[in-house]
Amino acid sequence: MIFDIFAFLCLIGAIGILITLSVIDLKIGLLPNIYNGALALLGIGFHLLTSFAWLSLLDFALGALIGGGMLYAVRMIANHFYKQDTLGLGDVKLLAAAGVWLGPQGVLMAITLGALAGLIHGIGVIAYKNIKKDSVGKVSHFSIPAGPGFAVGIL
């Protein structure tokens, strides 16, 4: 019984961290390591408290590797083509932490849903900024944080 309460608190803490990370990313464009690390530690704690009922040790390790690894690969490819930093390493760490919670299949779904949420967010930002005719073609200059979209995908 007591373990269920602590597992629930881990879950509530993770939701709070995802909201906090989203706000920070929207305001300053960073996903601080302390929050990503705390998210991962809460995931480990959750699985320990639930006796690995949701994911095995191997599954959450693979989830972290796949989540962080896939996003790191996307980042490297995008950086190569755009000749500048695209996704930040905070986004990579966020998806690695999500993999601890969600496992391999869940983190792939989170990446997909997060990318879709990010696309919708990006379209909204562009529409909100009301791009004028003279600025057409400059859409690539917008910097849209990926963290909030990924947070939505994770949830």
Q: Where do the language-model regions lie?
A:
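A membrane-topology feature that recognizes alpha-helical transmembrane segments
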Residues: 1-155
